[in-house]
Structures are given as structure tokens and as C-alpha cells.
Amino acid sequence: MSEQDMSADRVLFAPRTAPDGQDELLRLVYDRQQIVEVLHRYARAIDRCDIELLKSVYHEDATDAHGSFDGNAHEFAEFMVPRLRAQTSYGVHHVTNELVEVAGDRAIAESYMWGYHRIPGGRESVSRFFGPAYAARCEADGTLDAEHEYMTGGRYLDKLVKRSGIWRIWRRRITVEWNQCQPSRMLTDGGRSQYDIPGARDPTDQSYRLSFDSFDE
């Protein structure tokens, strides 16, 4: 796919015919897979609160316009991870519906995101995350001290660049198109909860134990 194919009048994400030549086709498939893995790696990094992994998603000169933050993406990682640790007890991000256009060492991607967060109860915690109006409603209905849930959905709009053979995000902008807030409905004792295997937001998470060195264990 040539630079000319990415001209200004080209409609992004429209159906395409296959490129000429098997090598070009394989390169396109490989590049797209690497880009999708970058998008998924972001979700892993943010949910494990792994600052260095989160930085690895972005080039050093990348920017992220992320609602409460708009600036250098490595600074975003330093800003967001401590904030998540301070304000939430758990989080899960899902990235889906990835549409990717590749032109040489540049790419454009749109993907959908869904996020879930649990917020500790109490006036200070609930007011800080949700605002005083929501906290007042919770106080009125007796749920202020309960754990709360915040669910949100939107899209990631990305420009990616391949440098030294590695794809990373160069420009990111997000949209947040809906949210839902409520006291937590999570089952915490009895029933199926006894079989829950919780994750962790640090290297004690079971995913960090995955290794080819212990593959046969």
C-alpha cells in the first residue's frame, strides 16, 4: 500500500482490494497484527498499573489527549497510573472493533473501548471521583459508604508510526460517549464469589508468572 493510497481524498476504513504481491500482502497482515497488539497492550498496561509497559505503547515524542490529560504520552503514564491507584480499587479495559489503515511506516486506527472501575466508598473517595452531586445522592439513599462502579465507553483514535521496526502510538485522542455510575453489585461473599480468582495491579498478578522458562510446570 503506497503513500499515494493514503491521499487526502481517500475514505478511511473503506473496503480494499488486496495489494499486489505476496510479500506486500504478508507485510500488511503482519503490520496490522502488530498494531492491534499495541492497542491491546495499552489495556494490559493500564489495568496492571504498569508504568513502564504503558510507556512502551507510545513513542517518546507521542501525545495523548485523554480528557483529564493532554500532553506528552510518557508523562501521561506517570500521571495516570498513580491516579488510578489512588482513586480506584480495580479496573478493566477492553479494546475491540479495531479498524486499521497502514501506509508504509504510518498507520491510522480507530478502536472501541469499554472500561470498568471500582471506587472505594466514603464521602472523600466518592466525591473526588464522581463529584459532590453524586455523593449527595448516595448519602441520601444510604449508599455513600458502599463501593461504587464506574463504567464508560468510547473510542481510541490513533496515529501510529513504525520506527526501527517497532510500531508505537504517535498521536492518541479519545472519545468518551457514555458512562454509568452505581453502587457496586459485585457478589463478594458466598455463592460464586468463593471461586473468584482476583487479579492484581502489580507484578504479583498471575500474568507476570507466565514464562517459557517454566513452560512445562
In which residue ranges do the predicted regions lie?
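Short, P/G- and charge-enriched loop/turn segments at secondary-structure junctions
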Residues: 84-87, 141-148
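A solvent-exposed, acidic/Ser-Thr-rich amphipathic alpha-helical stretch
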Residues: 51-136
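A structural signal for the main folded, soluble domain(s) of proteins
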Residues: 35, 102-104, 186, 200
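Short, low-complexity N-terminal intrinsically disordered segments enriched in polar/charged residues
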Residues: 2-44, 48, 56
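Short beta-strand edge/turn micro-motifs at domain boundaries
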Residues: 2-15, 108-110, 153-186, 190-192
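Short, hydrophobic/aromatic alpha-helical segments in well-folded domains
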Residues: 38-41, 53, 57, 96, ...
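A hydrophobic membrane-anchoring alpha-helix module
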Residues: 174-179, 186-217
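Transmembrane beta-barrel outer-membrane domains
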Residues: 33, 89-91, 149-151
